[in-house]
């Protein structure tokens, strides 16, 4: 309660827009992201908190497809959370470049990871059945054929140990309102593997996508 009062009366009430720099708001997406990173096996500085999970799915997929310009297939499974599939379909329509969302049964994911696939979009834990995909094996299979991976951690982050670094995941997204106990309205997050940072650019970048928003 004391922190909230300070934020409302001092940081927002007095600093107003200068609070972005003077109160440290500008760095909170990364500083909070570092706390999430410890729970999902990610490197400090490579998880950013903000927006919604659906937006983060869009951003991760857009980056992955841009990194594989010669491939047109997004591979997912019928047990995936519906909004992930909706975002993939929306991105495909926006790109209008002949991409395909290929949806297979959960147990058939591995055998369908072929050289046609640009990126796999998989929710680690099925929200209906609790089925858990083997992140390490599926990521290795994807990399063996030159594909990238986007993992949705909505039903795993905070529920059990996740090891993005150990599994070699390329991208991961998640939310903080479920097993991270952020509550209603709390933001999503995105992870980009360090090896990809120099080869990706933010999709849907806005005011905070500028290197110096107040310049």
Placement of each model-derived feature along the sequence:
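Pyridoxal 5′-phosphate
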Residues: 1-215
């Amino acid at each position: 309660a004391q922190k909230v009062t300070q934020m409302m009366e001092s940081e927002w009430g007095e600093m107003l827009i200068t609070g972005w720099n003077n109160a440290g708001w500008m760095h909170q997406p990364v500083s909070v992201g570092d706390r999430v990173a410890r729970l999902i096996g990610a490197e400090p500085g490579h998880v950013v908190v903000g927006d919604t999970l659906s937006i983060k799915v869009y951003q991760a997929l857009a980056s992955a497809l841009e990194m594989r310009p010669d491939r047109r297939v997004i591979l997912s499974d019928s047990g995936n959370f519906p909004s992930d599939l909706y975002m993939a379909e929306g991105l495909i329509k926006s790109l209008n470049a002949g991409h395909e969302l290929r949806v297979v049964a959960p147990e058939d994911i591995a055998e369908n990871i072929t050289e046609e696939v640009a990126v796999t979009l998989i929710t680690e834990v099925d929200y209906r059945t609790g089925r858990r995909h083997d992140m390490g094996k599926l990521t290795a299979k994807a990399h063996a054929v030159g594909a990238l991976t986007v993992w949705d951690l909505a039903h795993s982050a905070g529920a059990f140990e996740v090891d993005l670094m150990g599994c070699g995941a390329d991208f991961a997204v998640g939310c903080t309102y479920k097993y991270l106990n952020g509550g209603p309205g709390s933001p999503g997050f995105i992870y980009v593997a360090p090896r990809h940072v120099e080869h990706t650019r933010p999709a849907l970048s806005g005011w905070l996508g500028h290197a110096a928003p107040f310049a």
